[in-house]
Amino acid sequence: MEEEIINKYSLLKKFNVSRETYFDFESLISMIIKKNQEINIISKKTSKNDDIRTRHIIDSAQIIDFIDLNSNTTSDLGTGGGMPGIVVAIIIKNLKKKMKFNLYEKSYRKSLFLREVSKNLNLDTEIIQKDVFLSNKIQTGTIMARAFKPLPVILDLVSNNFKSYKNLIIFMGKSGEKILKETLKKWDLVFEKKKSITNKD
């Protein structure tokens, strides 16, 4: 049974992810499926076990090598159902690293869900039920953004509202190359691109 679960996460073999993490991921999937019957945690189109595992959990987990492990905090700009914030927090917990995750989420009901998940999985998170655009002078290590806002909007937010940070991780999607090309006309960025392991686009 254990090996069967671990094999479902074979795409993550080359990453810094412990075996214990996969069982926490399975618990997270169960909590998402249960809560998704009450509120829209994730799209109904991707709410089956395998879809959640690949399109949400593994997709979020693949950024772990870009997380600044020397920082005390990491921030997720609009975590929604906990992707990538909760997923990365699970990995960090099982790596025995001390790091707090500040997860911004405007929705009251999603915030309650995130607090419940954090409690059940013993995660070091602070669920901030607030529009991150209304916060300022934020200090953090890594900043994460997945399915949040367009790249130029995120860059403006980080530039205006963050006092300090180490690095910024943005999931770009299918039109990522085009958006990046347009953004570079206005922004002077030092960046590294990484091909997704869950999506050929």
What feature does the model see in each segment?
Residues 1-70, 75, 108-123:
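Class I SAM-dependent transferase core
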Residues 80, 147-150, 174:
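Short glycine-rich anion-binding loops that position phosphate/pyrophosphate groups of nucleotides
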Residues 100, 124-126, 167, 188-192:
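Conserved beta-strand segments of alpha/beta enzyme cores
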Residues 155-168:
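A short glycine-rich, Lys/Arg-flanked "PGG" loop and its adjoining helix->strand segment in the class I
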Residues 165-177:
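Conserved beta-strand signature within the Rossmann-like core of class I S-adenosyl-L-methionine
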Residues 175-201:
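Active-site capping/gating segments
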